[in-house]
Amino acid sequence: MNLFRLCVANLVALFWVVIPTAMGANIIPQPSYIQEKQGTFDLAHNNNILYVGKQPEVNQIIDNFMEQMLGDYGLSLQTNKSKKAGILLQDKKSLGEEAYELSVAANKVVIKASTPAGFFYALRTVNQLILADENHTSLPCILVKDAPRFSYQIGRAHV
């Protein structure tokens, strides 16, 4: 009987991991909410980023993201002061400390967070979505909402 329970528990654990991956967006860690939509956002032609907010640390996070996109994928992104920017980052004070909302539509990406950490995690999610694209130039249209499940980080061994 114990062997049967162990087998059932292993099957449940396997499906718990495999089913979300087979359903589409594979974002690690799994966000609190994902809604996939039809279409893609083309980063090669919508390469302007605009931050509308008052947190200077976010500008450094954006600069690091742009350097990574150029180095990893050859995508040249630029900051822009125009509201017509393809990627728009906005402060949203009602979100938690590290929470974010990422909305990707065919014509615009909107990222909302209340802290630099939230913007950082949102841009890490964007990077994972770019990795999923064969040519590394587009994002799937998607809505992602996430907040940390725990208010602390587990210690890590730095090697």
Task: List each language-model region with its residue ranges.
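Conserved small/polar residues in nucleotide/adenosyl-binding loops
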Residues: 157-159
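Contiguous, structured surface segment used for ligand recognition
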Residues: 24-152
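N-terminal secretory signal peptides that target proteins for export/translocation
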Residues: 1-5
